[in-house]
Amino acid sequence: MNKQYSYPLDLSWSTEELASVLSFFNDVEAAYEGKVEAKKLLDSYKGFKAVVPSKSEEKRLGREFETVSGYSLYRAVQAAKEKGKGKISLGK
């Protein structure tokens, strides 16, 4: 996928909040481009949800991220929840 894209970020977030959201986006990318521990992705998702508690905002960011990257936040989280332990890979 094209690695020259911008993440959907809210510039009103603090540095720590930006780091949490970016960590989650990076873990989703890792799930598609290689492998990532399911627990690591779920932990970063918890950090993301602490910053973005609203389901509608999560969906909006997910759509924007998928549009620019081709990677689905939802599918990555669902795969991690189903796997529980071990690594997940969503790459083709």
From Swiss-Prot:
Upper taxonomic lineage: Bacteria, Bacillati, Bacillota, Bacilli, Lactobacillales
Protein family according to the UniProt entry: Belongs to the UPF0223 family.
SUPFAM superfamilies on file: BH2638-like
Pfam families: UPF0223
Name listed for the protein in its UniProt record: UPF0223 protein SPCG_1392
Organism expressing this protein natively: Streptococcus pneumoniae (strain CGSP14)
Xref: InterPro entries: BH2638-like_sf, UPF0223
